[in-house]
Amino acid sequence: MVIFSRSFLALSTTLIILALCINSSTMAQETEDLNSHSSSNSSTANKLPNDDGAWNEHAVKNPEEVAAMVDMKIKNSTERRRLGFFSCATGNPIDDCWRCDRNWHLRRKRLANCAIGFGRNAIGGRDGRYYVVTDPSDHDAVNPRPGTLRHAVIQDRPLWIVFKRDMVITLTQELIMNSFKTIDGRGVNVAIAGGACITIQYVTNIIIHGINVHDCRRTGNAMVRSSPSHYGWRTMADGDAISIFGSSHIWIDHNSLSNCADGLIDAIMGSTAITISNNYMTHHNEVMLMGHSDSYTRDKLMQVTIAYNHFGEGLIQRMPRCRHGYFHVVNNDYTHWVMYAIGGSANPTINSQGNRFLAPGNPFAKEVTKRVGSWQGEWKQWNWRSQGDLMLNGAYFTKSGAAAPASYARASSLGAKPASVVSMLTYSSGALKCRIGMRC
């Protein structure tokens, strides 16, 4: 076995060297872009932290020790051996796409190539410059100060938005995003909390990654700027953490969301091509609403992937609650609910695959599903299926409609992994604590 381990180590090392050789020019180009695309604008004149010399606490100096570690992982983890993981991989295709790279901070935009599901084509600000947020204030929603998050998100050009340091941003009014933007909180601790939160309205190509959003409040009846050339009157906002309204190609990944006035993530009014992944959601009532109303038929075109999320303590219902449309709910970990986990009305197609459902102790709340405001003669025709889900503590999923795979083609966006590995796939859900110069 030692001979095998050394061979495995040598092969892994060779592959890594080849990958570094192939990508060295790309890495150099993006590093130059990161450090040189600063202008006189105070928001972009600050380079990102760069600490290539940081000691990697996971490094091992002794090659024999490395071989022994690899050998142990191969022998002790049946699932990892079967799926062919490397030592830093988890089987989560999003995380494995970028988190093994200790130089992630030098090539942040590669994250845009890692999306899966219906929102996989969301590129955010990949093709634009970096914008470094230096100022957590939000004193003027009409004339935002350069260097603030509000000033960044309203720009007409693509931008990859990062943060100079840890900060808590308390928004006075909705943060109305313009198209082709990425909010990237990796490497620092960023929270949007205690005020208004994020609105994605009639735009496209948005990535929100690595931030904390909590304690959002209702705001409005005020003027708010949405682009450099336009501002207007906003009525009262519901107080969602993230509100998606008439928008497409949206990716919400690795955020920690909790305790807001209305929903944590709502997608309505014809929104589609959305992936909600790797988020950690806690302490909230109505978690996710997908679809505006039973009568709003434009939502029949909605396609949403909900994958690798952890629905945690203090959640009550709507994980999600769907209307019309097509919803792929795959490899999520449901550890808490009070009323139900997945609900819907108006004939949505729900494809539940490879999830883990841990029912609450209440004997009257064991059912995963809820048909809202519908009688059985109506909902028995709706296509809701459970395939490969793991039901714990008496949890059960009430299926309906067709069983044929073809009926779920428009609600299928990626291959589901076994529910037995969900704990590993979702272990790092929520905003990550990434350190510059180390694997995240």
From Swiss-Prot:
The active site is at R318. SMART domains: Amb_all. It is an enzyme of class 4 (lyase). SUPFAM superfamilies: Pectin lyase-like (SSF51126). InterPro entries: AmbAllergen, Pec_lyase, Pectin_lyas_fold, Pectin_lyase_fold/virulence, PEL. Residues 1-28 form the signal peptide. Binds 1 Ca(2+) ion. Required for its activity. Its EC number is 4.2.2.2. Ca(2+) binds at D238, D262, D266. It catalyses: Eliminative cleavage of (1->4)-alpha-D-galacturonan to give oligosaccharides with 4-deoxy-alpha-D-galact-4-enuronosyl groups at their non-reducing ends. The keyword Ribosomal protein does not apply. GO terms for biological process: pectin catabolic process. Transmembrane segments: none annotated. Keywords: Calcium, Glycoprotein, Lyase, Metal-binding, Signal. Its cofactor is Ca(2+). One of its GO terms (molecular function) is pectate lyase activity. Pathway: Glycan metabolism; pectin degradation; 2-dehydro-3-deoxy-D-gluconate from pectin: step 2/5. Belongs to the polysaccharide lyase 1 family. This is Probable pectate lyase 10. It comes from Arabidopsis thaliana (Mouse-ear cress). The lineage of its organism: Eukaryota, Viridiplantae, Streptophyta, Embryophyta, Tracheophyta.
